[in-house]
Amino acid sequence: MRHYEIIFLVHPDQSEQVGGMVERYTKLIEEDGGKIHRLEDWGRRQLAYAINNVHKAHYVMLNVECTGKALAELEDNFRYNDAVIRNLVIRRDEAVTGQSEMLKAEENRSERRERRDRPEHSDSADGDDGDNSDVSDNADE
């Protein structure tokens, strides 16, 4: 069996069906003796260019080990499913199980956002109320 990285884009109006689609595709691979090494749902994202006047899509990425027969059936499912607006299948030399760069970047972005939104401790705890009353207005004294 060979290793593949599969990315497919689902029409944004069909985003609620993504879970069922992923379940159906993973079942198809596993029933043929294949294995899912990584599954990432990247969610709804902006497209680089419009596809059929659609500017956003729901992205899903799979790293699988499967037979050529299962892959052909999966590609047929993509081709005849109107909700899948694009798909890409890349043959890999080995199984990839770590997080993708896309998911790592998203987590880093959310961590930075949390740190930014976290309230800083106030300076009033040291007795300074911020009115600068102890600073002289006259600089040449």
UniProtKB/Swiss-Prot annotation:
Return the Acidic residues bias intervals. 125-141
* Record-linked PROSITE patterns: RIBOSOMAL_S6
> Mind telling me which residue stretches traverse the membrane in this protein?
none
Q: Which biological processes are named by the entry's GO terms?
A: translation
Decide whether keyword Plastid is in the record: no
Which keywords accompany this UniProt record?
A: Ribonucleoprotein, Ribosomal protein, RNA-binding, rRNA-binding
Query: What InterPro entries does the record point to?
Result: Ribosomal_bS6, Ribosomal_bS6_CS, Ribosomal_bS6_sf, Ribosomal_S6_plastid/chlpt, Transl_elong_EF1B/ribsomal_bS6
Source organism superkingdom: Bacteria
Q: Where is the composition biased (Basic and acidic residues)?
A: 103-124
Check the record and name the SUPFAM superfamilies matching this protein. Answer: Ribosomal protein S6
Outline the segment boundaries, as ranges, of region: Disordered: 97-141
Look up keyword Hydrolase and say if it applies. no
- GO cellular component terms given for this protein: cytosolic small ribosomal subunit
Instruction: Write one Gene Ontology MF term.
Output: small ribosomal subunit rRNA binding
Instruction: Describe its function.
Output: Binds together with bS18 to 16S ribosomal RNA.
Q: Which family does it belong to?
A: Belongs to the bacterial ribosomal protein bS6 family.
* Full protein name: Small ribosomal subunit protein bS6
